[in-house]
């Protein structure tokens, strides 16, 4: 994989930034604990002990997402966090969404 580093940001090369086929998504879902596809987006719900833990986790994810220049859609109420990943400019789930989902799983484990 070709990776460009620009001021602390990691940006995948163009051949790594692409929309995934249904078969590729299904294959990747088998490797992503807790994720499912809903309305064309990768989705996962996480539970924490309290709001502080949920918000702390969101901050960790935000820092990693910013490095990738790829940001989640999410919704937080108290200890619950709903996360949706989709690449709007490709109109679907992309390699970036899979990479961010893996990062989120690593941070949550």
Which residues does each PLM region occupy?
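Alpha-helical and His/Cys-centered functional microenvironments
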Residues: 6
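Charge-rich, low-complexity N-terminal segments
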Residues: 9-32, 38-48, 52-109
